[in-house]
Amino acid sequence: MTLKPLILIPARMGSTRLPEKVLAEISGKPMIVHVAERAKEAALGPTIIATDHDAIAQAVTAYGHEYVMTHTHHQSGSDRIYEALTRIDPEQRYNAILNVQGDLPTVTPNALISVLQLLKNNLTDIATLGAEIIEDNEKNNPNIVKIIGTPIAQNRLRALYFTRATAPYGNGPLYHHIGLYAYRRKALEKFVSLKPSTLEQREKLEQLRALENNMRIDVEIVDTALLGVDTHHDLEKVRKILA
């Protein structure tokens, strides 16, 4: 099946730890604009911001990007992009949906290309990225989500679990999950129809809902983890990177 991608960027105002972070200024532009620009550079398909707030819509429009308004109350970014998808594409022209977090301004075009490539395997429902953890302090940090997976090819895993704990035990690399996803459209439809699962709620990781319902997630291991913004400290680090 030929992949016809659509890139959706969920962006909301109601962040708990860093309010209005997607509008934070980085090198003269709002964070969300940096994300949209990198996504467009990948040239994979249309790039549209899914938002719940007029201020975000105005910010992205000022830089020539498209947006769609969604409801404020969604349990996850996946629910928001599914609502956006049904509004944008009721004709079902697009069969591969990339979910690029609005707080991931360090995303690269190559990262988007890499995650989409995983869907060329017809057995893969959802694709995502990971990177080896190098810093010791990150191995025990619950904010760094770890991937437990079985190797299926060079630099490629089939995910068995995601956790905030330090795992797996023993010698060998630990992998940091990068929150960038590519879904088959049918997989996204199935995912949002499922109730939040037991382990998802315990770990506070929505991707576990897919694994607990026998959906397959494949992971491409890339050289460098992409830095997302959850705190003021993260924001200052990103400002230095993108200066």
From Swiss-Prot:
HAMAP family listed in its UniProt record: KdsB
Catalytic activity line of the entry: 3-deoxy-alpha-D-manno-oct-2-ulosonate + CTP = CMP-3-deoxy-beta-D-manno-octulosonate + diphosphate
Pfam annotation, one family: CTP_transf_3
Superkingdom, natural source: Bacteria
GO BP terms, alphabetized: CMP-keto-3-deoxy-D-manno-octulosonic acid biosynthetic process; lipopolysaccharide biosynthetic process
Function as written in the Swiss-Prot or TrEMBL entry: Activates KDO (a required 8-carbon sugar) for incorporation into bacterial lipopolysaccharide in Gram-negative bacteria.
GO CC annotation, single: cytosol
Single GO molecular function: 3-deoxy-manno-octulosonate cytidylyltransferase activity
EC number, UniProt record: 2.7.7.38
Organism expressing this protein natively: Bartonella bacilliformis (strain ATCC 35685 / KC583 / Herrer 020/F12,63)
Protein family membership: Belongs to the KdsB family.
Protein name: 3-deoxy-manno-octulosonate cytidylyltransferase
Keywords: Cytoplasm, Lipopolysaccharide biosynthesis, Nucleotidyltransferase, Transferase
Pathways involved: Nucleotide-sugar biosynthesis; CMP-3-deoxy-D-manno-octulosonate biosynthesis; CMP-3-deoxy-D-manno-octulosonate from 3-deoxy-D-manno-octulosonate and CTP: step 1/1; Bacterial outer membrane biogenesis; lipopolysaccharide biosynthesis
Cellular localisation: Cytoplasm
InterPro entries found in the cross-reference section: Cytidylyl_trans, KdsB, Nucleotide-diphossugar_trans
Principal EC category: transferase
